[in-house]
A protein has these predicted regions:
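Short hairpin/turn module used for nucleic-acid contact or packing/dimerization
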Residues: 227-259
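A short, structured loop/turn motif at beta-sheet edges
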Residues: 20-23, 69-74, 119-124, 168-170, ...
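Acidic low-complexity segments
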Residues: 72-153
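Stable alpha-helical elements in mature extracytoplasmic
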Residues: 27, 126-129, 133, 158, ...
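Hydrophobic/aromatic-rich core segments of domains that either
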Residues: 160-239
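Short, solvent-exposed aromatic-acidic interface loops
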Residues: 33-34, 45-49, 156, 206-212
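Intrinsically disordered, low-complexity N-terminal segments that are enriched in acidic
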Residues: 1-87, 249-258
């Protein structure tokens, strides 16, 4: 109807770093692939005296800012305006359904196999297998888990052990880095895990094993790499800020069709 409105999100990523005076500068940062749930209405790369290019690789998008010379404190901006994609079309999703096991031996192998037995017993399919694996690895009182984590209980280390256990069962897993769409609240990328079940990607909370990505999460990039890399500079930092506004749904639908 005429009165219906939809959310429009403005996202700013502010990139700050210190350039070294001698070397050319190359800054690479992941930006959202925007291939499923959201559509971009406007995207800008703001800088002074930098060349800009955007590339796609392995399902991700990456912006590269480059300059022959720069010195001192540098600030670059990435700005994105997006909205939910409303489409009845079912896009065909592809993903891996098999993988090779990661190499493991010694006490780690025994610990991993000891964890695998109950995981297999309590699982019926990919979804329950991944969920059960995540729950087991988050049980920090388990001696087998303690041995595999080796004193490092960070989210990335836990994800690494979850990945190892899933590989023994030939179940593929990817790390997913998301941003939460909440107005006027500073955000940092949040780690999720996903696995392909033959039809679709299933998303899992790496702390609880709960399945399903909340609707306010925007997928920013997947894989093991960091959000940003800087050649010819140091102390790189990315700050996210966002706000939302409403727009007439009919007008927004027209804009969405144009993009």
């Amino acid at each position: 109807t005429e009165d219906e409105t939809d959310d429009l999100w403005n996202i700013d990523a502010k990139v700050e770093f210190v350039a070294s005076t001698k070397d050319p500068v190359k800054v690479q940062m992941f930006v959202p692939p925007l291939n499923r749930d959201y559509v971009s209405l406007n995207e800008s790369f703001i800088s002074n005296n930098y060349g800009v290019s955007v590339n796609r690789a392995d399902g991700n998008r990456k912006v590269t800012w480059s300059a022959r010379r720069a010195s001192g404190n540098q600030t670059l901006y990435y700005r994105l305006v997006l909205t939910k994609r409303y489409s009845n079309e079912k896009t065909t999703v592809k993903g891996p359904t098999f993988r090779d096991s990661l190499a493991i031996e010694g006490p780690e192998k025994i610990a991993a196999e000891a964890l695998m037995a109950p995981i297999r017993q309590h699982s019926a399919d990919v979804e329950t297998f991944v969920s059960e694996t995540i729950k087991r690895v988050n049980n920090l009182n388990d001696d087998n888990v303690k041995l595999l984590l080796a004193g490092d209980t960070s989210p990335m280390k836990k994800a690494q052990i979850i990945d190892l256990l899933l590989s023994i069962a030939h179940v593929p897993m990817e790390k997913v880095h998301t941003i939460r769409l909440v107005a006027d609240t500073p955000q940092t990328p949040e780690l999720w895990l996903r696995s392909f079940n033959g039809n679709d990607w299933l998303y899992f909370n790496p702390d609880t094993g709960e399945q399903g990505l909340p609707s306010d999460r925007l997928l920013w990039w997947t894989g093991d790499d960091n959000l940003i890399t800087v050649d010819g500079g140091k102390k790189a930092n990315v700050t996210f800020s966002m706000n939302n506004s409403e727009m007439n749904a009919i007008r927004l639908a027209k804009l969405t069709d144009e993009n």
